UniProtKB/Swiss-Prot annotation:
This is Capsid protein. Transmembrane segments: none annotated. It is found in: Virion. It comes from Cucumber mosaic virus (strain Trk7). Its main location: virion. Pfam families: Cucumo_coat (PF00760). Residues 12-22 have a biased composition (Basic residues). The modification N-acetylmethionine is found at M1.
């Protein structure tokens, strides 16, 4: 007896028949996943080779030590002639300097280049005698004595330099917040005149946590 015409056989053959478009849909999904992976890889490569102008904060780039936080100040160097220097002492907010005995562990400088940046600058931070007037002669000597790290930051035709950070470790010096007024950020414009709207410096001072006022302002 031929069972091919039975109801059960008809249902089986119907179940085995593939749905229209199922193979093409799965193929499209696989292609989309592969394209997504390629785009993610390309974005990661571009992020390394062509950094954006908005660099991460201290907290975003490196975690603070346990029990520490950081205070940021912004410096905008003025116009600096070719071969000349700029120096500015660190000035933290009063809400921080009120706790002048809190320990400072590190100072980080982040260079944020503005669209007009096309120069080469040397940047450092170091302890400066209170008697120093931060003259060109005094700053020149400080760059050459090797007592603090120096970041050389320059324009590149393919994009701005990826390494935009200088980290100065003060742990062994037992520095505190009160000592920060003795430190200065120094900038040297090497190849040409640095215009006042070419770079912004973000200075992050990592220090022990300070109490937070819970009183509303009057």
């Amino acid at each position: 007896m031929d069972k091919s015409g039975s109801p059960n056989a008809s249902r089986t053959s119907r179940r085995r028949r593939p749905r229209r478009g199922s193979r093409s849909a799965s193929g499209a999904d696989a292609g989309l996943r592969a394209l997504t992976q390629q785009m993610l890889k390309l974005n990661k490569t571009l992020a390394i080779g062509r950094p954006t102008l908005n660099h991460p904060t201290f907290a975003g780039s490196e975690s603070c030590k346990p029990g520490y936080t950081f205070t940021s100040i912004t410096l905008k160097p003025p116009e600096i002639e070719k071969g000349s220097y700029f120096g500015r002492r660190l000035s933290l907010p009063d809400s921080v300097t009120d706790y002048d005995k809190k320990q400072v562990s590190r100072i980080q400088i982040r260079i944020n280049p503005l669209p007009k940046f096309d120069s080469t600058v040397w940047v450092t931070v170091r302890k400066v005698p209170s008697s120093s007037d931060l003259s060109v002669a005094a700053i020149t000597a400080m760059f050459g004595d090797g007592k603090s790290p120096v970041l050389v930051y320059q324009y590149a035709a393919s994009g701005v330099q990826a390494n935009n950070k200088l980290l100065y470790n003060l742990s062994e010096m037992r520095a505190d917040i009160g000592d920060m007024r003795k430190y200065a950020v120094l900038v040297y414009s090497k190849d040409d005149k640095l215009e006042k709207d070419e770079i912004v410096l973000h200075v992050d001072v990592e220090h022990q946590r300070i109490p937070i006022s819970r009183m509303l302002p009057t």
